[in-house]
Amino acid sequence: MASVLEELQKDLEEVKVLLEKSTRKRLRDTLTSEKSKIETELKNKMQQKSQKKPELDNEKPAAVVAPLTTGYTVKISNYGWDQSDKFVKIYITLTGVHQVPTENVQVHFTERSFDLLVKNLNGKNYSMIVNNLLKPISVESSSKKVKTDTVIILCRKKAENTRWDYLTQVEKECKEKEKPSYDTEADPSEGLMNVLKKIYEDGDDDMKRTINKAWVESREKQAREDTEF
């Protein structure tokens, strides 16, 4: 800016010298007009310079923002959960998570799911997606908390004072498939046979030999009891 002002000042001095030496009206009018333009421009430049200085004095150094590392994403599979009358609480342990910026810990809720994303924690991103929650939750009232080395996801139950036996519908279905099915109207011995049959089918060779031996001994004992009568 100083060089521009200097050039304008030199132009102005030169125009003044020419004006003093000029005698012809047309030339003097042209020089007078040019002199006015230069003076106006010089005045504006000086005002800009005086206004710019306080702005620079008040200007604070720009905050250095650490670049967001795009490292690979780790899928979170280990977590714990419990519940109260109003909330289902999911606990995820991530060492150092309390030290990352708040905006780096994001949770998106829907009525039957949540999606956790932790960005740039020790050079990695961490993701946890849980779909098909056992029961509906209130999206607006659900939230997250970041504690020392822990993220707590708070899913607000849509129906308060109801108990969740499982976190997801899929978990419920898997557990129920594992349970042996009993028919209350069927013969109790038939139910036992079904259980033994399942154990036999799923067991190894040693288990099968043990069941076969027990089965033979049971049949022999039953035969002896029948002959006694």
Swiss-Prot record:
<dbReference type="GO" id="GO:0019005">
    <property type="term" value="C:SCF ubiquitin ligase complex"/>
</dbReference>
<feature type="region of interest" description="Interaction with SIAH1">
    <location>
        <begin position="2"/>
        <end position="81"/>
    </location>
</feature>
<dbReference type="GO" id="GO:0015631">
    <property type="term" value="F:tubulin binding"/>
</dbReference>
<dbReference type="Pfam" id="PF09032">
    <property type="entry name" value="Siah-Interact_N"/>
</dbReference>
<feature type="region of interest" description="Interaction with S100A6">
    <location>
        <begin position="155"/>
        <end position="229"/>
    </location>
</feature>
<dbReference type="GO" id="GO:0005641">
    <property type="term" value="C:nuclear envelope lumen"/>
</dbReference>
<feature type="modified residue" description="N-acetylalanine">
    <location>
        <position position="2"/>
    </location>
</feature>
<keyword id="KW-0597">Phosphoprotein</keyword>
<dbReference type="InterPro" id="IPR008978">
    <property type="entry name" value="HSP20-like_chaperone"/>
</dbReference>
<feature type="modified residue" description="N6-acetyllysine">
    <location>
        <position position="86"/>
    </location>
</feature>
<feature type="modified residue" description="N6-acetyllysine">
    <location>
        <position position="119"/>
    </location>
</feature>
<dbReference type="InterPro" id="IPR037201">
    <property type="entry name" value="CacyBP_N"/>
</dbReference>
<dbReference type="Pfam" id="PF04969">
    <property type="entry name" value="CS"/>
</dbReference>
<comment type="function">
    <text>May be involved in calcium-dependent ubiquitination and subsequent proteasomal degradation of target proteins. Probably serves as a molecular bridge in ubiquitin E3 complexes. Participates in the ubiquitin-mediated degradation of beta-catenin (CTNNB1).</text>
</comment>
<dbReference type="InterPro" id="IPR037893">
    <property type="entry name" value="CS_CacyBP"/>
</dbReference>
<keyword id="KW-0833">Ubl conjugation pathway</keyword>
<dbReference type="Pfam" id="PF05002">
    <property type="entry name" value="SGS"/>
</dbReference>
<dbReference type="InterPro" id="IPR007052">
    <property type="entry name" value="CS_dom"/>
</dbReference>
<dbReference type="GO" id="GO:0060090">
    <property type="term" value="F:molecular adaptor activity"/>
</dbReference>
<dbReference type="GO" id="GO:0005829">
    <property type="term" value="C:cytosol"/>
</dbReference>
<feature type="modified residue" description="N6-acetyllysine">
    <location>
        <position position="10"/>
    </location>
</feature>
<dbReference type="GO" id="GO:0042803">
    <property type="term" value="F:protein homodimerization activity"/>
</dbReference>
<feature type="modified residue" description="Phosphoserine">
    <location>
        <position position="36"/>
    </location>
</feature>
<keyword id="KW-0963">Cytoplasm</keyword>
<dbReference type="GO" id="GO:0005737">
    <property type="term" value="C:cytoplasm"/>
</dbReference>
<feature type="domain" description="SGS">
    <location>
        <begin position="169"/>
        <end position="229"/>
    </location>
</feature>
<dbReference type="GO" id="GO:0019904">
    <property type="term" value="F:protein domain specific binding"/>
</dbReference>
<protein>
    <recommendedName>
        <fullName>Calcyclin-binding protein</fullName>
    </recommendedName>
</protein>
<dbReference type="GO" id="GO:1990830">
    <property type="term" value="P:cellular response to leukemia inhibitory factor"/>
</dbReference>
<feature type="region of interest" description="Interaction with SKP1">
    <location>
        <begin position="74"/>
        <end position="229"/>
    </location>
</feature>
<dbReference type="GO" id="GO:0030877">
    <property type="term" value="C:beta-catenin destruction complex"/>
</dbReference>
<keyword id="KW-0007">Acetylation</keyword>
<feature type="modified residue" description="N6-acetyllysine">
    <location>
        <position position="21"/>
    </location>
</feature>
<dbReference type="InterPro" id="IPR015120">
    <property type="entry name" value="Siah-Interact_N"/>
</dbReference>
<feature type="modified residue" description="Phosphoserine">
    <location>
        <position position="3"/>
    </location>
</feature>
<dbReference type="GO" id="GO:0005654">
    <property type="term" value="C:nucleoplasm"/>
</dbReference>
<dbReference type="InterPro" id="IPR052289">
    <property type="entry name" value="Calcyclin-binding_UBL-bridge"/>
</dbReference>
<feature type="domain" description="CS">
    <location>
        <begin position="74"/>
        <end position="168"/>
    </location>
</feature>
<feature type="region of interest" description="Disordered">
    <location>
        <begin position="38"/>
        <end position="60"/>
    </location>
</feature>
<dbReference type="GO" id="GO:0044548">
    <property type="term" value="F:S100 protein binding"/>
</dbReference>
<dbReference type="GO" id="GO:0031625">
    <property type="term" value="F:ubiquitin protein ligase binding"/>
</dbReference>
<dbReference type="InterPro" id="IPR007699">
    <property type="entry name" value="SGS_dom"/>
</dbReference>
